UniProtKB/Swiss-Prot annotation:
It comes from Alcanivorax borkumensis (strain ATCC 700651 / DSM 11573 / NCIMB 13689 / SK2). The lineage of its organism: Bacteria, Pseudomonadati, Pseudomonadota, Gammaproteobacteria, Oceanospirillales. The gene is proS. Its main location: cytoplasm. This is Proline--tRNA ligase. NCBIfam families: PRK09194.1, proS_fam_II. PANTHER family: MITOCHONDRIAL RIBOSOME PROTEIN L39/PROLYL-TRNA LIGASE FAMILY MEMBER (PTHR42753), PROLINE--TRNA LIGASE (PTHR42753:SF2). Belongs to the class-II aminoacyl-tRNA synthetase family. ProS type 1 subfamily. Keywords: Aminoacyl-tRNA synthetase, ATP-binding, Cytoplasm, Ligase, Nucleotide-binding, Protein biosynthesis.
């Protein structure tokens, strides 16, 4: 591609409303342009990357035995009513009507549509297992679209759905798809982790998320330094401490703490080690009108997912209001503790081994110091309630945990029969009996993958694309094509030769741009390989090569440049 005939669309300034690196660089590199809130037009450079991501996904889905289909973006609301999701999905589901006043929606996902297709097309166990995928536009009316294409309203997803006669068959396909996802992200050149994930309200036997590691990620990922264990922090088990609870070292003491309504204030004002304090969090109980107190160490955070799974706690998790707490205890939330608390108390495992700790006295402006279990208050029910932290032992017993931020780019799920049962998707088994088909679903955020790749691969000069998804493989930059016939002739020759070999070349044939601008554009775009053609080098029989990830330039003999590039690109 000649730059003079290409919509390069690079800009020097970073747009003020672009917060994350990927959004900034995609705008500056001319990959996308904002049309409206959460809506983006993909320009040529961005689309080239997007199509390469799609192609890798398509190849691996085909290799995994999935069949490609294409379903409508617009879906009839009657399918959503049949599945029961119409009222539950909320305002993210953009509802529309046609000229005949028939209700439709813009599809945020396609479980209903694919299940409707399958119930009409598959009738016998002999047709199973069956796995279908599409790469299609989705629309979710996000209340606050942000971070560019990372969280937009319109986006492209690869969604696949498998159908089975039993859960064993589903488990087999699930593993095939897990391996396919690993192959996809390996080929895309991303540093990622497949992690155990919460199955949520849908339930199901298993769920894994695929996260690209990046500081801008919205999720915390825990993984072991001694094994392959990895999980979303919300799911990672915090093992019980192996140490014994120390014996009491001091008498319990009630202290006036009028200005200490948070753990941070208590620690600061009374010079307490934060790990010697307890937070008391009150939530609604499973029984109507009941409250439950959850205790975690002062330096730990309550894990809402774990708390919600407790039998005594209401689902969904709901924290008690100050009014409800005062009515039950006679004190505000900032003065609560386990001593004489008049309702069910559940303590985290780490709390159970604490001694001489501080907590609220259930009186406004007062705390107990030097509380000890069994001496001052009975040891309550114990459960895993907290988020894991850096340095915790790995739940699989191998190594310790490291916590890093991750961007979720994929999610695979054993759905079970939620949708197939609701929509009556059945087949006849080998005995002629009608059985509901268990389902699996497997999603990849295609547009989000592009942003995640940038978040992980950039420097102060621009994007550093992994080879597999760069918009161009080679940038060909003559220093002064307007005034140097020799540079033009060699550039044209190399361009023709490389293009004939199937190498994607951006030939910067602009006559009015300075060399500095041309080089800055190639670095901003993240093109992996750059050749600079200069008369001075040609006089010495060399050209200048620089890889996008390289710190230094290399001089390469003119007659060896093609072979050199082929070797760099792994084409030999």
């Amino acid at each position: 591609m000649r730059t003079s005939q290409y919509l390069l669309a690079t800009v020097k300034e970073t747009p003020a409303d672009a917060v994350v690196t990927s959004h900034q660089l995609m705008l500056r590199a001319g990959m996308v342009r904002k049309l409206a809130s959460g809506l983006y037009t993909w320009l040529p450079s961005g689309l080239r990357v997007l199509r390469k991501v799609e192609q890798v996904i398509r190849e691996e889905m085909d290799r995994a035995g999935a069949q490609e289909v294409l379903m409508p973006v617009v879906q009839p609301m009657e399918l959503w009513e049949e599945s029961g999701r119409a009222p539950a999905y909320g305002p993210e589901l953009l509802r529309i009507t046609d000229r005949h006043n028939n209700p439709f929606c813009l599809g945020p996902t396609h479980e209903e549509v694919i299940t409707d297709m399958v119930r009409n097309e598959l009738h016998s166990y002999k047709q199973l297992p069956a796995n279908f995928y599409q790469i299609q536009t989705k629309f979710r009316d996000e209340i606050r679209p942000r971070f560019g294409i990372m969280r937009s309203r319109e986006f492209i997803m690869k969604d696949a759905y498998s159908f089975h006669t039993n859960m064993d068959s589903l488990a087999d396909t699930y593993q095939i798809m897990h391996r396919a996802y690993c192959a996809i992200f390996d080929r895309l050149g991303l540093d990622y982790r497949p992690v155990e994930a919460d199955t949520g309200a849908i339930g199901g036997a298993a769920s894994h998320e695929f996260h690209v590691l990046a500081e801008s990620g919205e999720d915390d990922i825990a993984f072991s330094d001694g094994s392959d264990y990895a999980a979303n922090v919300e799911l990672a088990e915090a093992l019980a401490p192996t140490s014994e609870r120390p014996a009491p070292g001091a008498a319990i003491e009630k202290v006036d703490t009028p200005n200490a309504k948070t753990i941070e204030e208590l620690v600061t004002q009374f010079n307490l080690p934060i790990e010697k304090t307890i937070k008391t969090l009150v939530v609604k109980g499973a029984e109507e009108g009941q409250l439950v107190a959850l205790l975690v160490r002062g330096d730990h955070e309550l894990n809402d997912i774990k708390a919600e799974k407790l039998d005594a706690v209401a689902t969904p998790l709901e924290f008690a209001s100050e009014e409800e707490i005062r009515k039950a205890v006679g004190a505000g939330p900032g003065s609560l503790g386990p001593v004489d608390l008049p309702f069910t108390v559940i303590a985290d495992r780490s709390v159970a081994v604490m001694s001489d700790f501080g907590a609220g006295a259930n009186e406004d402006g007062k705390h107990y110091f030097n509380i000890n279990w069994e001496r001052d208050v009975a040891l309550p029910q114990i459960a895993d309630l907290r988020n894991v932290v850096d340095g915790d032992p790995s739940p699989d017993g191998s190594g310790t945990l490291t916590i890093k931020r991750g961007i979720e780019v994929g999610h695979i799920f054993q759905l079970g029969t939620k949708y197939s049962e609701a929509l009556g998707a059945t087949v006849l088994d080998e005995n002629g009996k009608s059985v509901v088909m268990p389902m699996g679903c497997y999603g990849i955020g295609v547009t989000r993958v592009v942003a995640a790749a940038i978040e992980q691969n950039n420097d102060d000069r621009g994007i550093i694309w992994p080879e597999a998804i760069a918009p161009f493989q080679v940038a060909l930059v003559p220093v002064n094509i307007k005034k140097s016939p020799r540079e033009r002739e060699l550039a044209e020759k190399l361009y023709a030769e490389l293009t004939a070999m199937g190498i994607e070349v951006l030939f910067d044939d602009r006559e009015k741009e300075r060399l500095g601008v041309k080089l800055a554009d190639t670095e901003l775009l993240g093109i992996p390989h750059r050749i600079v053609i200069a008369e001075r080098g040609m006089d010495n029989g060399v050209l200048e090569y620089k890889g996008r990830r390289d710190a230094d330039k290399t001089e390469v003999a003119m007659d060896e440049i093609v072979a050199f590039l082929k070797e760099k690109m792994g084409m030999n």
